[in-house]
Amino acid sequence: MKSDIEIARETDLRKIKEVATTLGIPREEVQNYGRYIAKVPIHLIDKKQMDQHNLILVTAITPTKAGIGKTTVSIGLALGLNKIGKKAVVALREPSLGPCFGMKGGAAGGGYAQVLPMENINLHFTGDFHAVTSAHNMITALLDNYIYQTRNTCEGLKEIKWKRVLDVNDRSLRNIVSGLGGSANGVPTETGFDITPASEIMAILCLATDIEDLKRRVGNILLGYTNEDKPFTVNDLGIAGAITVLLKDALLPNLVQTTENTPAFVHGGPFANIAHGCNSISATQMALTYGDYVITEAGFGADLGAEKFFNIKCRKAGLSPKLTVIVATAQSLKLHGGVPEKEIKEPNIEGLKNGFANLDKHIENMKSFGQQVIVTFNRFATDTDEEIALVAEHCEEKGVGFAMNNVFAEGGEGGTELARLVVDTIENHPSAPLQYTYDLNDPIRTKVQKVAQKIYGASSIVYTTLADKKLRQIESLGISHYPICIAKTQYSFSSDPKAYGVAKDFELKVRDVIINNGAEMIVVVMGEIMRMPGLPKEPQARKIDIVDGMIEGLS
């Protein structure tokens, strides 16, 4: 089979204004970024139209390190729906350069189910990530200047909560000391870098409803505390307007197309293990305004991305999906069934069966939100017919719809079985009204307990001294009503990345609590999860090259 980049280059792309016209977006409203990429103004969102259309969430069982193919399936489902005569749009997150050059590679789908132009999308795209990085680090620079200028006055700060960000995987930047070299170079400070998708600015961009809401949220970002223990925000620096200016264009959703010219909104990019893991509210709402069926995805397994999608994004935006699709693969089931990672591509019926416990827990979790659930099997070349039949049989026993998909190899044609099941389920057995895991008025500890016990299956939770201190600060600030965003490993229900399957009777340790006052959420850090990833021994960057002006090795 041809490589992703070869397939992408052979696709006959339509000019982006033509793609917009197929949706009903006026040509004069489209802001071109070249021939095949555009931004669309937020004022086109129509809440009345949204309510008449169908939102579908694509999530997954606990993934392997190579991923599970959610983005490919999301794109392929949109292609399949269009194949059977439905007006479908897909709404996805933007890829990050860190994983693109790190372990996973790009995030524009794969095979014959991609969003295009994939080279642009996987690399610099419309500059949204650069805008987030610039805005975040501009705050840091202005904050450092304030600290320097007030270092010998009563207006100084004693506790700083704001780091820097870069869109790279670089473990050496996690903990640094800035301001070295004498008094002319600033005040020495222990600090560090997070990756851009973990930036509070990224979360704000994805949750803001318009430019005024964006500015309000930016102004409320908590940067630290004064010598009198008072919170110090971006508004106190007097720079909310300046930072919003840097984000003005990044706020607008990006319109692109798939390998079969299906419209796609690709906007925002928080990770689900260290942030809330969903594309922007504005992109999802734009897609719902113009598409009868809108497919979106949430990062990693359903315990992370989907939980935050429902408890944070849907609650904030008033969204309620008609259906949730859980993606499973033979390789991931075997990994969670006790098969060594290096052997998961080999046939192993017993290991596959043992992995059903992981699938069942995710199904149970999605049903706890009132969701109607179907399972789709993302086929790989190494899968056997017997393995596929066993998964289908298991889903039937559980009373859950099942559909094969082979969209990677066949595009929309390989997604028609799934598309028909999706339409039939929505028409005859749609999801119930959304039920949340916790109430916003619950104390933070209660929220953590409910997610940890109901979604992860934890038996107990302990807090470090630092986390206890942060919880007291939250109470004093009067923001205990914020939703929580748990940061933990994506490879297990527990905080141990090697506890495959369904962990039992385990303790979760809350290491830190981060106040995202602008994003209006509380980030709860569990285990050893890092907000700045590192690179593997063999990074994807070693496969990427440019020959005669053409990019090679990007996938």
From Swiss-Prot:
GO annotation, biological process: tetrahydrofolate interconversion
Pathway the protein contributes to: One-carbon metabolism; tetrahydrofolate interconversion
Binding-site residues, ATP: T64, K65, A66, G67, I68, G69, K70, T71
EC number: 6.3.4.3
Entry protein name: Formate--tetrahydrofolate ligase
Molecular functions per Gene Ontology: ATP binding; formate-tetrahydrofolate ligase activity
Keyword Lyase: no
Keywords: ATP-binding, Ligase, Nucleotide-binding, One-carbon metabolism
Originating species: Parabacteroides distasonis (strain ATCC 8503 / DSM 20701 / CIP 104284 / JCM 5825 / NCTC 11152)
Gene: fhs
HAMAP family, alphabetized: FTHFS (MF_01543)
NCBIfam families xref list: PRK13505.1
Family, similarity comment: Belongs to the formate--tetrahydrofolate ligase family.
Lineage summary: Bacteria, Pseudomonadati, Bacteroidota, Bacteroidia, Bacteroidales
Record flagged with keyword Nucleotide-binding: yes
Reactions this protein catalyses: (6S)-5,6,7,8-tetrahydrofolate + formate + ATP = (6R)-10-formyltetrahydrofolate + ADP + phosphate
